[in-house]
Amino acid sequence: MDKFTTLEGVAAPLKIINVDTDMIIPKQFLKTIKRTGLGKGLFSEQRYKDDGSENPDFILNKPAYRNAKILVAGDNFGCGSSREHAPWALLDFGIRCVISTSFGDIFYNNCFKNGVLPIRVTQADLDKLFDDAERGANATITIDLGKQEIRGPDGGTVKFDIDPFRKHCLMNGLDDIGLTLEKKASIDSYEDKAKTERAWA
């Protein structure tokens, strides 16, 4: 998992509440267990028309937001069924941070495990970030995880809270496997000791 320390980029404003995981990544894309290639399925029912052509009205199809790294979204983002493919799709598209007032619990947890930072802010702060995001490619936003702040294009800042352990994992690029490998020396020592003291086992 790539480390997350600071992120600077264009933020796409998605002013829709209750975006569920089926909208983020529809069920037909869940057949794979690969984490790559899912970006094409991100919001596919909104990004594409029935004939397969792009919907020019959807935010991520607009020229200013095609390379967005941050998503500013309406309340209760990521609600609905459990599917780890949702953060995989966001990440594969290039989005590493989602900002909203609230998230579906399972989606929220899955984001941290896959290198995507979900940030909760107040409605007032979200409205300000929507305004910043609507300025497009001329107004980048910076996420500073170390300082736990969002810096807008005009220098204004929004502070956010994050669990210290999750912050540690993101800043050091540690997923579940990485966390286990951090304890490799202790695990090896335990196993060597067990072989000596419990040779019969």
UniProtKB/Swiss-Prot annotation:
GO terms for biological process: L-leucine biosynthetic process. GO terms for molecular function: 3-isopropylmalate dehydratase activity. Keywords: Amino-acid biosynthesis, Branched-chain amino acid biosynthesis, Leucine biosynthesis, Lyase. Its EC number is 4.2.1.33. GO terms for cellular component: 3-isopropylmalate dehydratase complex. Pathway: Amino-acid biosynthesis; L-leucine biosynthesis; L-leucine from 3-methyl-2-oxobutanoate: step 2/4. InterPro entries: 3-IsopropMal_deHydase_ssu, Aconitase/3IPM_dehydase_swvl, AconitaseA/IPMdHydase_ssu_swvl, IPMI_Swivel, LeuD. It catalyses: (2R,3S)-3-isopropylmalate = (2S)-2-isopropylmalate. Pfam families: Aconitase_C (PF00694). Disulfide bonds: none annotated. It comes from the Bacteria. Catalyzes the isomerization between 2-isopropylmalate and 3-isopropylmalate, via the formation of 2-isopropylmaleate. Heterodimer of LeuC and LeuD. Belongs to the LeuD family. LeuD type 1 subfamily. This is 3-isopropylmalate dehydratase small subunit.
